[in-house]
Amino acid sequence: MYSKVKSLGISGMEAFAVTVECDISSGLPRFDVVGLPDTVVKESRERVRSTIKNCKLEFPLSRITVNIAPADIKKEGALYDLPVLIAILKSSGQIKENVDDYAFIGELALDGEIRSARGILPMIMSAKEQGLNKVFVPEENAYEGSVVDGVEVYPASHIKDVLLHIKNEKPIKAVKYNFDEEVKYEYNIDFSDVKGQDQAKRALEIAAAGGHNCLLIGPPGSGKSMLAKRLPTILPDMTFEEKLETSKVYSIAGKIPKGKSLVSKRPFRSPHHTVSAQALTGGGANPKPGEISLAHNGVMFMDEFPEFDRRAKESLRQPLEDGVVTVSRTAGTFTYPSSIMLVAAMNPCPCGYFGHPSKPCTCSDAAKKRYKDKVSGPLLDRIDIHVEVSPVEYDELSNNSESEKSRDIKKRVDKAREIQRKRFEGTDITCNAKMTPKITKECCVLSEEADNLLHESFDSFAMSARAYDKILRLARTIADLAESKEIKLEHIAEALQFRTLDRKYWDE
């Protein structure tokens, strides 16, 4: 007897419709799974067989063929256990009710318990697009899936619960997402914790206001990491669309905590400098998002930047420029979102004390050159703001007066972002850092004095076209913070000062 059951699958960042077909025919007992399954999917035969036996159901002693379509897409993971079991029960006549209105997702334990699966959110979003409005998911993932309006998400903890619902003996109540329960995330760190470092704080305020990448250069203990960790506290609150995008990435990576639905705060990722290029960009045998994508709509902090593997550093080029990372593997080509703010931190030399007012540098010129050469020119070009973080003076540390709080800086950032939102209304651009060269030219109107200064600087600093555009975007953000429609002399001057450190450290 033939039956088919609906399910869903994940390939890269996208979900797709899956049909699990089952045919039970006469012949020697045999259980085959076809349809380009991976090893885990093939192993579902034993999980399904044991579950049927342990739940006092009848396993057909016939020839069983299960096809997981479409056959041209590789199926990965154990999430097909539940639909395979339902298809077998349907084919063997143990389920007589119509299940065409339902889709089934979930891994089975041998006792019939339904375990969590990754990628539930994008799969439910895909179900809605395909007109599927009833989906059984593991209980642990139900709240995550309930975010999608228009789809009834049924939490299932055991196969018996699913069967009782199908037979209408004990209906399961669909989970409803309560938007009123969303709470604003409160940070337990604040910019006021950082003593001194006014220039670095100003640089991070500009970075937050325009979505710019930033490089912090300074000796050990100057507060680079402390500053970077506080950057999310002044970033604008995430919109619902941003929460959905970010949660989709985290869902596919299997990083949404049990009982949670949306990622409500801006991600902050801080990979160790020994991380591989693949761990940064994503991919692998079973492709998953990497650190860059896990920082989507948030901040990725790379401390000890020169110490990262060169391939790992250079793999940042495309994501920083395009906002996406494309990974090509044998299984196919996958594109992951990576709209991030990069904050990189480094010492000025291997010992860390080049230019220090009191501690002498012990590095040779050759050692300093080798250290700085670990960061390539094209990568530096993609970082908008270069700021020197000087050692904190005793007077600043001992000063008991309270520094400006994150909430006050955030108000200015929010105001600048609102100006940008209105400016880019009707486009895909979200902030000044994402402006195309054409839009940069249209939106960056310079006063005569500002234009003259930029012209002189372009010639004397031998700027690239990319660096020129980045200075304009940076000046546009500074002008937005000052609520000025025109980019004035002081805005260009401040933007230029954040682009001169590469001359000091790399061209000396």
Feature locations, PLM:
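Conserved alpha-helical scaffold flanking the Walker A/P-loop in AAA+ ATPase domains
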Residues: 205, 261-262, 266-267, 277-300, ...
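Walker A/P-loop
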Residues: 216-257
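Basic, amphipathic alpha-helical bundle interface domains used for macromolecular binding and assembly
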Residues: 40-45, 60, 67-77, 286-287, ...
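Walker B catalytic acidic pair
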Residues: 297, 303-304, 315
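Residues immediately C-terminal
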Residues: 110, 300-301, 307-308
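Peripheral, non-AAA+ core regions of ATP-driven protein-machinery
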Residues: 1-215, 219-225, 468, 485-508
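Short beta-strand elements
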Residues: 18-24, 280, 384-387
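The Walker A (P-loop) glycine that initiates the GxxxxGKT/S ATP-binding motif of P-loop NTPases
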Residues: 218, 282, 304
